[in-house]
C-alpha cells in the first residue's frame, strides 16, 4: 500500500475512513498499559498529530509499547472515525514496523524549551511544534511568492551568488577566494593581487540580485529573483542575519507608482495565501506567539496602504510632540522608532514613504527634478517598521554616471550596468523584500534566527 500523509487524512478524511492505510512518522508521545496503548504520531506534513491505537494483537507489542519519543515507525491499520473523542479519527494498528529507535536522551522532551535553547539544536528543532509550524509556513509563503509572480507573467531569473559588483555600494560583503591565506600574493603597490585569484579579480558573495535582474527586465519586461543574499554586517540584532533570502522584482516601463501597486498587491497575496492554506499553524501562532496576530494581518490585507513623501513624514513626526531617542530633522535616515510611529500612531495601517533625500539612498535610484530627492519608496508596516525598500531606477546614463562619482564607485566595475542605459534604456522600477521579514510579520516570531532553518550570524556558523 502507498503511504498516506497525515495532512491528507485531515484534509480529506472521507476518502480514508474505514479503510486500511499506511502512515509513517515519529512518535511525539506514547501512553501504554498492560494490554493496549496510544501513540501520537507526527509525519511533519501537518500541525496536528495522528492517534495510533496499539494492542496485544501486534506481534511486537512489547517493543512498540516501550519506544522512546522520536522513534520512527511505519504503521499499517484501519482509519476509524471517533466522533465522541477530541480527535476526529484514529488508526487501529494491525502492524507497526520500527524504522529507527530514538535514544532516551533525546533533547526535545515534552516540557517547553526556550527559543534560545532550540537554536543550539537547530538540526532537531523542526521536530518541535513551533518550528515545524514556522518552516511549513516558510515553504507555503515561498510557493505563494512564485505563484503571485507567475500568475502575473513575470519571468523568474536566477541571479549569481558570486559577483564583482556591490549593489548597495556599502562594501559590507563576504569575499570569495581560493588564495593561500598563509601566502597571499601582493602587487607592486603592496595590495592583494587578485589577478592570481580564481576569478582573476576580487569576487564577493552577492548582497542583492537587483542589478542583474535589471538587465533581464530590460529584455523580458517583468522579472523577479528570489534567492539567498549575504551581508557582512557585524549586527547582532533580532532583525539581522548574515545570510537571508530576498524577493526582488524588476519591471520595465514602470514608475514608482507601478512598483508600489505591485508591492501592495504582493504583500496582501502572500498573507492571504498563508492564512487560507495553513489555518492550524496560524491559529497556533495567534494563540501562543502573538495574540494580536490575526488583528494585525487583517488590518494589512483589508486596508489601502497610505502613501506620503519623506518630507511629509518628517513634518508629521516633528509636529507629533513625541520625544524620540533619535531627533527628527530633514535629511536623516528614518529609524525604526520613527517608522513605527508613522504606521502605528499616525495612520494605523501600512504606509509607503516616498522621495527620500538622495544622500541617504543608493546610487541607482532615479534623481527627482528637485535634485535633492530620489524616486524611492519604503513600505512601513505596524509592529515592525520597514519591510520593503524600492525605487524607480535611474535610466539616464549621464545622471547615473554622475551619481556613481558621488558614491566614489569605480565605473569599470559596473561597465555592463551602464551599457544597459546605452541600448534602448527605459524607465524601470523594482523593490526588495526580505523574505524572513515577512515571515516574522506573519508568524509573530520576533527573532530572524527563528524563521531561518540554519541561521548565519556574526560569530555563529554552526551546522
From Swiss-Prot:
Transmembrane segments: none annotated. SUPFAM superfamilies: Class II aaRS and biotin synthetases, Nucleic acid-binding proteins. GO terms for molecular function: asparagine-tRNA ligase activity; ATP binding; catalytic activity, acting on a protein; nucleic acid binding; transferase activity. Its main location: cytoplasm. HAMAP family: Asn_tRNA_synth. One of its GO terms (biological process) is asparaginyl-tRNA aminoacylation. PANTHER family: ASPARAGINE--TRNA LIGASE, MITOCHONDRIAL-RELATED, ASPARTYL/LYSYL-TRNA SYNTHETASE. Its EC number is 6.1.1.22. One of its GO terms (cellular component) is cytoplasm. It comes from Clostridium tetani (strain Massachusetts / E88). The lineage of its organism: Bacteria, Bacillati, Bacillota, Clostridia, Eubacteriales. Keywords: Aminoacyl-tRNA synthetase, ATP-binding, Cytoplasm, Ligase, Nucleotide-binding, Protein biosynthesis. Pfam families: tRNA-synt_2, tRNA_anti-codon. This is Asparagine--tRNA ligase. It is found in: Cytoplasm. It is an enzyme of class 6 (ligase). NCBIfam families: asnS (TIGR00457), PRK03932.1 (NF003037). It catalyses: tRNA(Asn) + L-asparagine + ATP = L-asparaginyl-tRNA(Asn) + AMP + diphosphate + H(+). Belongs to the class-II aminoacyl-tRNA synthetase family. Homodimer. InterPro entries: Aa-tRNA-synt_II (IPR004364), aa-tRNA-synth_II (IPR006195), aa-tRNA-synth_II/BPL/LPL (IPR045864), Asn-tRNA-ligase (IPR004522), Asp/Asn-tRNA-synth_IIb (IPR002312), NA-bd_OB-fold (IPR012340), NA-bd_OB_tRNA (IPR004365).
Amino acid at each position: 500500500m502507498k503511504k498516506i500523509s497525515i495532512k491528507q487524512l485531515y484534509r480529506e478524511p472521507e476518502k480514508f475512513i474505514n479503510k486500511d492505510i499506511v502512515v509513517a512518522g515519529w512518535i511525539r508521545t506514547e501512553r501504554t498499559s498492560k494490554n493496549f496503548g496510544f501513540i501520537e504520531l507526527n509525519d511533519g506534513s501537518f500541525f496536528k498529530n495522528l492517534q495510533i491505537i496499539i494492542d496485544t494483537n501486534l506481534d511486537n507489542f512489547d517493543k512498540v509499547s516501550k519506544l522512546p519519543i522520536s522513534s520512527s515507525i511505519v504503521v499499517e491499520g484501519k482509519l476509524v472515525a471517533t466522533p465522541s473523542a477530541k480527535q476526529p479519527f484514529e488508526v487501529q494498528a494491525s502492524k507497526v514496523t520500527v524504522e529507527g529507535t530514538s535514544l532516551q536522551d533525546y533533547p526535545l522532551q515534552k516540557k517547553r524549551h526556550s527559543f534560545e535553547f532550540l537554536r543550539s539544536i537547530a538540526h532537531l528543532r523542526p521536530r518541535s511544534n513551533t518550528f515545524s509550524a514556522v518552516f511549513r509556513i516558510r515553504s507555503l509563503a515561498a510557493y505563494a511568492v512564485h505563484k503571485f509572480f507567475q500568475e502575473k507573467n513575470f519571468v523568474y531569473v536566477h541571479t549569481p551568488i558570486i559577483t564583482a559588483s556591490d549593489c548597495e555600494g556599502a562594501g559590507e560583503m563576504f569575499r570569495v577566494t581560493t588564495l593561500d591565506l598563509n601566502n597571499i600574493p601582493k602587487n607592486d603597490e603592496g595590495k592583494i593581487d587578485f589577478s592570481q585569484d580564481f576569478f582573476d579579480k576580487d569576487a564577493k558573495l552577492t548582497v542583492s540580485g537587483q542589478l542583474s535582474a535589471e538587465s533581464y527586465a530590460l529584455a523580458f519586461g517583468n522579472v523577479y529573483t528570489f534567492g539567498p543574499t549575504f551581508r557582512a554586517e557585524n549586527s547582532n540584532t533580532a532583525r539581522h542575519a548574515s545570510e537571508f533570502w530576498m524577493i526582488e522584482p524588476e519591471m520595465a516601463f514602470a514608475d514608482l507608482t507601478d512598483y508600489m501597486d505591485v508591492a501592495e498587491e504582493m504583500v496582501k497575496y502572500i498573507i492571504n495565501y498563508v492564512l487560507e492554506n495553513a489555518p492550524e499553524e496560524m491559529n497556533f501562532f495567534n494563540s501562543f506567539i502573538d495574540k494580536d496576530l490575526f488583528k494585525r494581518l487583517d488590518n494589512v490585507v483589508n486596508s489601502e496602504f497610505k502613501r506620503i513623501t519623506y518630507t511629509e513624514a518628517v513634518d508629521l513626526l516633528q509636529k507629533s510632540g513625541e520625544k524620540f531617542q533619535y531627533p527628527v530633522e530633514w535629511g536623516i535616515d528614518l529609524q525604526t522608532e520613527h517608522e513605527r510611529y508613522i504606521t502605528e500612531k499616525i495612520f494605523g495601517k501600512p504606509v509607503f514613504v516616498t522621495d527620500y533625500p538622495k544622500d541617504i539612498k543608493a546610487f541607482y535610484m532615479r534623481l527627482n527634478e528637485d535634485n535633492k530627492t530620489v524616486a524611492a519608496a519604503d513600505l512601513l508596516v505596524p509592529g515592525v517598521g520597514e519591510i520593503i525598500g524600492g525605487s524607480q531606477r535611474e535610466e539616464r546614463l549621464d545622471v547615473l554616471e554622475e551619481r556613481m562619482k558621488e558614491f566614489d564607485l569605480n565605473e569599470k566595475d559596473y561597465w555592463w550596468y551602464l551599457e544597459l542605459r546605452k541600448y534602448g534604456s527605459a524607465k524601470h522600477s523594482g523593490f526588495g523584500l526580505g523574505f524572513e521579514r515577512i515571515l516574522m510579520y506573519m508568524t509573530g516570531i520576533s527573532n530572524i534566527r527563528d524563521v531561518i532553518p540554519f541561521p548565519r550570524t556574526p560569530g555563529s556558523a554552526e551546522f
